[in-house]
Amino acid sequence: MIPCTIRYEFIQKFNVSAQRAFVWCTDYRPDDMKLMKEENATRRVQRIANEVLILFDTFVDKERKGIEKQKLVCIYPKRLTWTSTHLTGPNKYSQFIYEVTALAEGKSQLKFTALSLDYENRYKEDTERKSKAVKKGDAKKWKLLAEEMEKDTC
């Protein structure tokens, strides 16, 4: 089956400098899921090289089935950018781009760009509805992460 493409983007503002935001965001740890209020999820981090890692995220659904997503993360410090490409899971081969930029007064923002592949929906209407829903969910997680970042870096 050919997947449908779901594209969306949003901006999340941070009350910390671009460099601090970038370092905080790319410091992947096993307890990251708790920061996003993902109670039924775990994360394992495998460092491949200094700026390359694989995330093994496991989510337990309502039927108590485990869904594992393996993500290849490539970090570009000079650009304050990183990518996350799904290697396995329900959104296999989806890719997400994260770009941190400086704002005035020592603040910054993240531009989140998603190209998500949906193997379940085949109708344009379903894809548009799902795009809005996943964008809202991802934006909510980044809002939580922004709050945690402020607590952690102040």
Go through each PLM region and give its residues.
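Hydrophobic ligand-binding cavity/cleft-lining segments
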Residues: 1-50
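Short, surface-exposed coil-to-beta transition loops
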Residues: 7-9, 55, 64-69, 91-97
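A short, structured loop/turn motif at beta-sheet edges
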Residues: 15-19, 48, 73-78, 99-109
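Hydrophobic pocket/interface hotspot
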Residues: 21-25, 72, 82, 110-112
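Glycine-rich portal/gate segments that line the openings of hydrophobic small-molecule binding cavities
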Residues: 29-30, 41-87, 145-154
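Beta-strand/loop substructures that line and gate deep hydrophobic ligand-binding cavities in soluble
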Residues: 85-140
